Design a protein with these regions (language model features):
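Gly/Ser-rich helix-loop-strand patches that form or flank binding pockets
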Residues: 97-137
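Generic structural signal for helix capping and beta-alpha/helix-loop junctions
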Residues: 44, 87, 110-112
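Structural beta-alpha unit
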Residues: 1, 71-101
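Small/aliphatic-rich secondary-structure junction motif
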Residues: 1-50, 78, 126
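Short, surface-exposed alpha-helical segments at coil->helix boundaries
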Residues: 53-64
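Short, flexible/disordered intra-domain loops and linkers
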Residues: 46-55, 112
């Protein structure tokens, strides 16, 4: 399979640098278009009514800084910043425009894994394109 359009679902820049780096390597190997997708959930930037936690609302400039820091090969990366109420559904919708979706996978505890799928598993179960899963420690 030859990939022409690759998308990375980018969540948290500290942990996803490894995922971004892998996506750049694959895109370069196939000379493919690379798009970094980040979904700001609708409540991002505002305190949660439950616990007061404020989820960070990323800007295109912040994501561009992350790409510049990780992208030592200066491979062209398009940044797509979207807002949605559900991250999984938004990633699935945007992934319809690509051949390969690159995702990070965080280990879940036994209890969490036995009661539900991780976000990346939920996404992969509904994808219409190939997926590359990068383990994040």
């Amino acid at each position: 399979m030859e990939y022409k359009k690759i998308m990375i679902a980018f969540e948290e820049h500290d942990q996803d640098n490894k995922v971004l780096s892998a996506a750049i390597d694959v895109a370069q190997r196939y000379n493919a278009e690379l798009t970094l997708l980040h979904i700001n959930e609708r409540g991002a930037g505002y305190p949660s009514p439950v616990d007061g936690h404020i989820e960070h609302r990323y800007t295109e400039e912040e994501l561009s800084e992350v790409v510049t820091k990780v992208n030592t090969k200066n491979y062209p990366v398009t940044i797509l910043l979207a807002k949605a109420s559900g991250v999984g559904d938004a990633v699935i919708e945007h992934s319809k425009a690509c051949d390969l979706l690159v995702l990070g996978h965080r280990h879940m505890s036994f209890l969490a894994a036995s009661t539900s799928d991780s976000m990346d598993e939920e996404i992969v179960n509904q994808l219409q394109c190939h997926a590359l899963i990068i383990p994040i420690t």
